[in-house]
Amino acid sequence: MKFVGAHVSAAGGVDQAVIRAHELEATAFALFTKNQRQWRAAPLAEDVIEKFKQACEQYGYTSAQILPHDSYLINLGHPVTEALEKSREAFIDEMLRCQQLGLSLLNFHPGSHLLQIDEGKCLARIAESINIALDATEGVTAVIENTAGQGSNLGFKFEHLAAIIDGVEDKSRVGVCIDTCHAFAAGYDLRTEADCQHTFGALGDIVGFEYLRGMHLNDAKSEFNSRVDRHHSLGEGNIGKTVFSYIMHDPRFDNIPLILETVNPDIWAEEIAWLKSQAEI
């Protein structure tokens, strides 16, 4: 079973994200559980939590179909202790919000060394940050997203993801989300079926498909191996549609959220319908 959707707005309350996903005829969705550009947010009120859970039940979404994303401000590999602590506290808060909403996944960008510490130290800090968050929460899996490798962001190599997982004590609560645009921009080609076989073969060998908890399905405005993160609508960018059809046919991508973060929300329903049609061919 393929779960396909988009990262929808939670404006007006997290329950509104569920309704928006349903209106797209999505079978999965992503959301922010708070303003992603602020450090702090008011705690989730009981009535808000209840409305969200009721909406999920009404429209048939389980936690396996929902991939919340944390704040972009968080850097779990920050080289400066005070800033690292601030990020860790914010990440625990994000995990707790997911826990309150009955969600089982939290997607996040791993972190950046800011040219102040080496890659190895930064990756170890990220793993330690995850361990601290897992100790402080229950039932939520930390889902590390691969990056395009802009600036000093880590996570652009599958080896980075594997190194972080290696440092996490509870392997049952850590996973990865692969963004097709980020992978392409980081030098993992996806333009042909042979490219897909090679790239996903490497993912299986280096990270392991047992850790795959979600996908972000994005075409790329950015060039191959450019280390630039610029999303595009499916089939309109430099990757093309082959990989998205490939994913919809491959059972290794079953039963996880497959989430659009493409640039034109007006055609999300169309893109979701096209992806579903590929699964049926």
UniProtKB/Swiss-Prot annotation:
Cofactor: binding comment: Binds 3 Zn(2+) ions.
Positions annotated to bind Zn(2+) 1: H69, H109, E145
UniProt keyword list: DNA damage, DNA repair, Endonuclease, Hydrolase, Metal-binding, Nuclease, Zinc
One protein family per Pfam: AP_endonuc_2
SMART domains in UniProt: AP2Ec (SM00518)
GO BP terms: base-excision repair
GO molecular function: deoxyribonuclease IV (phage-T4-induced) activity; DNA binding; DNA-(apurinic or apyrimidinic site) endonuclease activity; phosphoric diester hydrolase activity; zinc ion binding
Known function: Endonuclease IV plays a role in DNA repair. It cleaves phosphodiester bonds at apurinic or apyrimidinic (AP) sites, generating a 3'-hydroxyl group and a 5'-terminal sugar phosphate.
Family classification: Belongs to the AP endonuclease 2 family.
Protein name: Probable endonuclease 4
